[in-house]
Amino acid sequence: MKAILLGLSLFPLAVLAGEKIDKQIEVANGGTIYIENQRGDINIRGWDKSEFKVSGELDDKADGYELKTSGDKTQFIVNMPRNTDWGNSGDGSKLTIFMPKSSTLEFAGVNVSVTAKELQNSAEIDVVNGEISASNLAGNIKLTSVNGDVKAQNLSGNIAFETVNGEINDKNSSGKLRFSAVNGDIKSNSTASDVRLENVNGDIDFTLSSIKNLRINTVNGEAEVHIKELLKGADVRFESVSGDGEFYFAADVSAKFEIEAHANGKIINKVTSDKVSKAKYGPSSSLKFSINGGNANVEMNTISGRLELHTK
């Protein structure tokens, strides 16, 4: 009965601006934790307890908060006045939150930076202006910042990164990776076998271990891609507009290569002695060859860019 009462509890909504908070309630393991905080710095961490705990100081413009749980859903919202100025005036919330490792995290905010660690059952973090730092997360993971960097380490599962004006730095990820960025560089060191990227106005620096599927589409950016191993049947595709691509493959790479360059693009082949063919008409060139049995496929296409193939 006590657990049921706790499950339906709703903490008082009215608190003084900037007031300290220290609350803890029982929640369902494997449920969903929804957190909404519009401004400040939020530190979220998974633990082994079937409890949700929040401590720290609320935004000095906050109009109370809600903390409630029902069934497998828990909600913590820092309420803000409707006419809130989302600028930098005043202090945002400074909160540390603990939640079950087995629960799913959903976070939304505006001018807020978020750190999330040690969660095993998926996480979605969406902010407008702020940095996201994530480590040791697993499951379906989506990290989105419109104006801010995203830093990640030791993520596993189905992982998606999105930024508009910010950099993405991914270390030691595994599973499937998706990147979408505008006006920001992307760096990844990953064992993911399935990687896809779309970006505009940003450089790419990839170090990939074992690739089955790789798709890169870039506009106005430089790409440097190191692939330690192409798995049998692997499919690699690269397209660029006004952007260069340097690809480094293993010395014993087995693949069929089909490379095209248009509008004065250039192809440099340092994998084999095969020569680039110039088009009879127009400023285009192409290169086709197979090496070591051709167990994978590599297709590249550039408009006004430079493509370089290397082994190491």
Task: Write out the residue ranges for each language-model feature.
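Intrinsically disordered, low-complexity terminal regions
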Residues: 1-312
